[in-house]
Regions:
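Signature of soluble extracytoplasmic/periplasmic domains of secreted precursors
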Residues: 1-171
């Protein structure tokens, strides 16, 4: 599993995250890689979760493509089977707090009700809450030409899903 998350933080900033399902050994591999790159690797702990920085600029974009270019600073941690990458320790701490406090989509009743209409098996899922008015983010800049922001501001949930079968995509 691989995901890209863009949130509109209460600070007014857009925070971007890349989430990759992985085993805990991935942290050890990344830490070892860091030791070979820099003499002073970044290391911190927040609420019992170790935070690191991978000192390879734009590594996610280079490995995964331009969709992941918004995460370029590569601060990361491992939580419940997932590597989480973002641009700052503050953003990562916010993610950790939300996860530990269960303030995520998995625990959101509106999202749970909405996902009853979404297949649990898909290759690509885009989910957005346009009513949050986060239309200034990089993701939405490309959509402004064909989307009336006022109309979309009244929509609480929007999803687009792609699934493959026999080398064909279905939505």
């Amino acid at each position: 599993e691989l995901g890209y998350i863009s949130t509109f933080a209460s600070s007014g900033n857009t925070e971007n995250y890349v989430v990759i399902q992985s085993k805990s050994e991935a942290i050890d591999m990344l830490r070892h890689l860091n030791k070979n790159i820099t003499e002073n690797p970044y290391n911190d702990t927040h609420r019992g979760v170790e935070i690191y920085k991978l000192h390879i600029p734009d590594v996610l974009q280079r490995v995964l493509g331009n969709l992941f270019s918004a995460v370029y600073e590569n601060y990361f941690c491992w939580i419940n089977g997932y590597l989480i990458f973002t641009n700052s320790p503050t953003a990562l701490k916010t993610f950790i707090n939300s996860n530990l406090s269960r303030k995520t989509l998995a625990y959101n009743i509106y999202y749970q009700n909405y996902t009853e209409n979404i297949s649990s098996k898909c290759n690509y899922l885009f989910y957005s809450n346009p009513s949050l008015n986060n239309w200034t983010s990089d993701l939405y800049k490309n959509l402004k030409d064909w989307v009336n922001v006022e109309d979309w501001s009244n929509i609480n949930a929007f999803a687009f899903q792609l699934t493959t079968n026999n080398e064909l995509f279905y939505n």
